[in-house]
Swiss-Prot record:
Keywords: Toxin-antitoxin system
Similarity remark: Belongs to the UPF0165 family.
Domain of life: Archaea
Name this polypeptide is given: Putative antitoxin PF2058
Its job: Possibly the antitoxin component of a type II toxin-antitoxin (TA) system.
């Protein structure tokens, strides 16, 4: 399974990174827009740990997608 970011432009989803797929592979795509992802992340229950910068943690999560 891969999680990728893409831009929707002119009726086409365009991946921001090269996909590791064989030509003509059939895939299933679940669309989660940035607003929905933000709600999901904000709803997660994370125990607050002293000394952790949660803003940087959230940024690292986005970068890992």
């Amino acid at each position: 399974m891969q999680v990728i970011e893409a831009i929707y432009e002119d009726g086409v989803l365009k991946p921001l990174k090269k996909l590791k797929l064989k030509e003509h592979s059939k895939v299933i795509i679940k669309i989660i827009d940035e607003e929905e992802l933000e709600k999901i992340l904000d709803s997660m229950v994370i125990e607050k740990v002293e000394g952790i910068d949660y803003k940087k943690l959230k940024e690292a999560y986005y970068e890992s997608l």
